[in-house]
């Protein structure tokens, strides 16, 4: 989920973004992001992954949203990404990463990989109608 955010990293690109640090902007975006994340979690099967990213520096839009999810969904856990460990957020012990402009990795942003604990259920069998679908007919029309 690349959630809409206050876009504080736009400033590092030289793009004006008035009000991006205002509490109303960061708080409103954090609330909207939580709604998006909660909806995304409903689509996540056990054993599935959700990558959460923003292009902002605001903790309420980043680490605090992750902690919000973990508190309400004990079946979730953060996943350590070894390649990102140099960018581990100092604001939480969870596996959250902040890439800042001074790291040389662009204008900055935040990311966290979430995992829903459990085994993936087996895929249901395909319906007979799908198995009987005439793929060969479509292939002959393409050639």
Regions found by a protein language model. Give the residues of each.
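SAM-dependent transferase fold signal centered on methyltransferase-like domains
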Residues: 1-143
